Amino acid sequence: MTMENKPAGQNGLTYAQAGVDIDAGNLMVEKIKPLVRSTRRPGADGEIGGFGGLFDLKAAGFKGPVLVAANDGVGTKLKIAIDADIHDTVGIDLVAMCVNDLVVQGAEPLFFLDYYATGKLSPDQGVAIVSGIAEGCRQAGCALIGGETAEMPGMYRDGDYDLAGFAVGAAERDRLLPRGDIAEGDIILGLASSGVHSNGFSLVRRIVELSGLGWKSQAPFQPGATLGEALLTPTRIYVKPLLAAIRACDGIKALAHITGGGFPDNIPRVLPKGLAAEIDLPAIAVPPVFSWLAKTGNVEPNEMLRTFNCGIGMIAVVNPAKVDEVIAALAAEGEKVVTLGRMTRREKDGVIYKGQLAL
């Protein structure tokens, strides 16, 4: 019996009936094309739809580059975005977590790809997410050259989704970080964070649960914002200010992105054996969100320091003779910079604290 001669109601199942709507996916692609084009840069044409994204490294102006790659996600911060129904900021977080890991190695981010997985595709939700990704790419100066949208019924609860990002950058071989001349007496600078960034949100969510507040409640630490809005403040992207400072003078020897694990886990990753970072904790202007989290959750200072950035999202190890130049270059790009300490001989721990954190 041909398909045309089958009795009504006896046609075969469709992919849409199984839970995957190809038309919704195509609609989303059409809606995000202008967002993708807004991330154009030398080396990328800003078009999507092919089987792979293209990038012309020569057009980007490098002579003898080393490619640097990073991938990351946003973690359980996504759960707050889902529950608060705010989806246009987590894309910035996704880009930030990847490109900040590139710039700490001295690399300029070139292009970015994303992975968006959900149980039931909502084109409007997807467009909101990609609008954030595009904004993050513009802030970082990298092109969004492709991605994957996966609709997987049965894998996620209704409304849930996950994100992953992939970034590739390049640096001239002689400008890679960390440098090999980090020495005792080098100065440690801290760049202010925009808030919690994208780490520690399992603890954040537990503290909010204990507080009895909801995502639509007034944020106790940020007048004029709901708790959801305040906690979803996007991760700061440090790429352009740091690249400007690196190019302005030869003063930056190492950079450390302060993510999960805080100071004690991230700073030692860029230090040579035998050296430790001495951090003056009272120098940190702790944002109110961290004081609220610490007090509401009864979290000890050392636990705060190994879970959150506590107000410092990026660390720079700087030649003492070039400190003023580096600070000036960063300040010119809008960064709030504080002198946090210095490099010292390592006896035991890779990070040594002086004083107390003002929580």
Swiss-Prot record:
Protein name as catalogued: Phosphoribosylformylglycinamidine cyclo-ligase
Residue ranges of coiled coil: none
Highest taxon of source: Bacteria
Predominant cellular place of this UniProt entry's protein: cytoplasm
Catalytic activity: 2-formamido-N(1)-(5-O-phospho-beta-D-ribosyl)acetamidine + ATP = 5-amino-1-(5-phospho-beta-D-ribosyl)imidazole + ADP + phosphate + H(+)
Signal peptide start-end: none
NCBIfam families recorded: purM
Any one of the GO BP annotations: adenine biosynthetic process
GO cellular component: cytosol
Pfam families tied to this protein: AIRS, AIRS_C
Enzyme Commission code: 6.3.3.1
Cellular compartments annotated: Cytoplasm
Keyword terms, alphabetized: ATP-binding, Cytoplasm, Ligase, Nucleotide-binding, Purine biosynthesis
InterPro entries attached to this UniProt entry: PurM-like_C_dom, PurM-like_C_sf, PurM-like_N, PurM-like_N_sf, PurM_cligase
CDD domains hit by this protein: PurM
Cysteine pairs bridged by disulfides in the record: none
Pathway: Purine metabolism; IMP biosynthesis via de novo pathway; 5-amino-1-(5-phospho-D-ribosyl)imidazole from N(2)-formyl-N(1)-(5-phospho-D-ribosyl)glycinamide: step 2/2
Family of this protein: Belongs to the AIR synthase family.
GO molecular function: ATP binding; phosphoribosylamine-glycine ligase activity; phosphoribosylformylglycinamidine cyclo-ligase activity
